[in-house]
Amino acid sequence: MKTTELRAKDVAGIEAEIKALQKAHFSLRMQKATQQLSNTSTLRTTRRAIARAKTILAQKQAAH
C-alpha cells in the first residue's frame, strides 16, 4: 500500500492494515522455513510495508 493511501486512512484503519501485514509476513516466514517460498523478496517488501504503516501511525498519533 502506498503512503498516500495510508495517510488517507484513520488510525483504526492503519492498525487493521498493520495486523493484516503482520499475518501475511508470518505466513511468508513459515513458507520460507518449510522451503515453500520461491520469491524471498516478498519478505523484505512486507517487512518494509509494516514499518511504513507503523511510522505513519506514530505520526498521526503524535499530531493529535
UniProtKB/Swiss-Prot annotation:
InterPro entries: Ribosomal_uL29, Ribosomal_uL29_CS, Ribosomal_uL29_sf. The keyword Ribosomal protein applies. One of its GO terms (biological process) is translation. GO terms for molecular function: structural constituent of ribosome. GO terms for cellular component: ribonucleoprotein complex; ribosome. Pfam families: Ribosomal_L29. Keywords: Ribonucleoprotein, Ribosomal protein. The keyword Ribonucleoprotein applies. Belongs to the universal ribosomal protein uL29 family. NCBIfam families: L29. This is Large ribosomal subunit protein uL29. It comes from Verminephrobacter eiseniae (strain EF01-2).
